[in-house]
Amino acid sequence: MTSSPVSRVVYNGKRNSSPRSPTNSSEIFTPAHEENVRFIYEAWQGVERDLRSQLSSGERCLVEEYVEKVPNPSLKTFKPIDLSDLKRRNTQDAKKS
């Protein structure tokens, strides 16, 4: 009886068959996506509420801001954006078209 080599599946890391995101300005959000966004939003609102509360009452720190001791050089040009403003602008652009 001869033994044949075991076949192996090799992945190259590329996904050619994955669906592409919509190219038009109207995005499609699944209920799971909306639930995840809502969870993150509510959790962050809780953190901000706790931080405001602790700052006004002077109580022991429950929320602590993380600041890197050695900044990442690749983030030197990073500029945070206001997501609410970005969404508002995208909504206005969609209404114009």
Curated annotation (Swiss-Prot):
One of its GO terms (cellular component) is cytoplasmic stress granule. Residues 15-26 have a biased composition (Low complexity). Its main location: nucleus. Belongs to the MCRIP family. Pfam families: FAM195. One of its GO terms (biological process) is negative regulation of gene expression, epigenetic. This is Mapk-regulated corepressor-interacting protein 1. InterPro entries: MCRIP (IPR029428). It is found in: Nucleus; Cytoplasm, Stress granule. The phosphorylation status of MCRIP1 functions as a molecular switch to regulate epithelial-mesenchymal transition. Unphosphorylated MCRIP1 binds to and inhibits the transcriptional corepressor CTBP(s). When phosphorylated by MAPK/ERK, MCRIP1 releases CTBP(s) resulting in transcriptional silencing of the E-cadherin gene and induction of epithelial-mesenchymal transition. Widely expressed (at protein level). Interacts (unphosphorylated form, via the PXDLS motif) with CTBP1, competitively inhibiting CTBP-ZEB1 interaction. Interacts with CTBP2. Interacts with MCRIP2. Interacts with DDX6. The modification Phosphotyrosine is found at residue 41. The modification Phosphothreonine is found at residue 30. Coiled coil: none annotated. Residues 1-29 are annotated as: Disordered. The modification Phosphoserine is found at residue 21. A motif (PXDLS motif) lies at residues 80-84.
